[in-house]
Amino acid sequence: SVYCMYGNKALRIQKRKLRQKLNSEDHKKRGQAVFNHLAMTELLNQVRVLGAYIAFDGELDLSPLIKSCWKAGITIAIPQVQKSRLIFRNYTPNSKLVKTELGLLAPKADVRIPLQKLAAILVPLTAFTKKGDRLGMGAGYYDRSLKEVPDLIRIGVAHAFQEVSEVDTHCNDVTLDAVVTEKRFVITSRRGKSLPMLQYAR
């Protein structure tokens, strides 16, 4: 739709500008807050292989979470674009990071992890709704890849200001099971309350 082309494009630009304005102290605090929210759920108790990302363009910083996962023996898988799909590589404290063609950082030569091995994935985004609609950067890499593994638990990671009341659903990205921001953890209506990994730990 026309709105899809122009409305979503304008929304992406607006939200990206907001997150690019944050300073390193903001990023540090927000990254820690996101980790604190996720640490209250069963996710880190149950997951063995977790998809994550290395922050770029003002995205929410997952460093505190990733470091905690390493200590707990959880394998971290980081995406890399290959032939318009995402492939995932094991990311360890010893990984050498290289800048890929899109300007993203990815582990250079670490072991490839099949998407089917991931139990959950933390997905960056430019805008989201509380129903779990996600607007990405527009290239569709996550959409194409995640549609191949419908059972994979998808958790959007965003700044609270990236929440909107709606995004155009004719062209929006894959739906999310939950969204975590620096302010809260929201289970969306996609598969909602039925996922044990997303419940608060007792």
Features from the language model and the residues they span:
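Conserved phosphate- and dinucleotide-binding cores of soluble alpha/beta proteins
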Residues: L86-R202
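N-terminal active-site beta-alpha-beta segment that forms phosphate/nucleotide-binding
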Residues: Y3-K117
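Intrinsically disordered, low-complexity segments enriched in small/polar residues
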Residues: S1-C4, G51, A139-G140, L198
